[in-house]
Amino acid sequence: TEAQEGRRAADEGDVSRVIVEALAPLERELTVLTVSSSAGIVTCTPIGQRQESGDYRESWQPATEPDGEAERARDIARTAVEGLVAKAQAAGETGWGVFGVELFVLTDGSILFNEVSPRPHDTGMVTMASQRLSEFALHARAILGLPITPKHVALTIPAGSVAASHAIVVAGDGEAEFTDVAAALAEPGTDLRIFAKPEVHGHRRMAVALAVGESEIGRAHV
């Protein structure tokens, strides 16, 4: 059994403790971009996300969440980054920049911390369409010592609307060619960011499409 294999591995190793984890029934994932700057720590509106084979494909902001979930998610993200920044400052560093905090929302509504990326996050590309300052602008300003306040991370999309980003993944070998760009950009509320990647070898994320819709259904249609 798995338990016996775990015990055998522990007996063969040079450690005396093991970690036993319970099954966490996952419903969905959230990303909370958290910014540490000279003005302190602020959190962005939670971002919903969808993955394929463990890789980002789509994200949207604000995430669709029950009452109170957004604030609980932001509190967890803030606490995690506060701890990281405290360690950085104890080592003589500033700890400034954007942190992508990933969270698990379980089927019972509870929220678990998953991991944190000390940099702009792929799911955060949606902020190029949703916020006053994108995650990239926030990161640059923060590490340059400029203050970041809640006003800097405010959503700028119309009330009740949703912004979304979708990764454009190209399969093949050689140069990538984009077609029908004009038709895609003719749709109101859309944008396209093509990355400066000259070639594809296998599967590679080559661009991201951005859109703003009046609702999550509208976002999906766009």
Where are these regions (language model features)?
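Short, well-ordered beta-strand elements within core beta-sheets of diverse protein domains
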Residues: A22, V126-M128, A209-V212
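Active-site nucleotide/adenylate-binding loops and adjacent lid/helix of ATP-dependent enzymes
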Residues: T1-V85, P188, G213
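Short, flexible active-site loops
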Residues: G54-T64, E115-M128
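Protein kinase-like catalytic core scaffold
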Residues: V42, F99, I111-E115
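Peripheral (often C-terminal) accessory segments that flank ATP-dependent C-N-forming ligase machineries
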Residues: R141-R219
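Active-site "cap" helix and flanking loop/linker of ATP-utilizing ligase/carboxylase catalytic domains
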Residues: E71-V101, T107, S117-G174
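Short beta-strand micro-motifs enriched in acidic
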Residues: V35-S37, F104-L106, F195
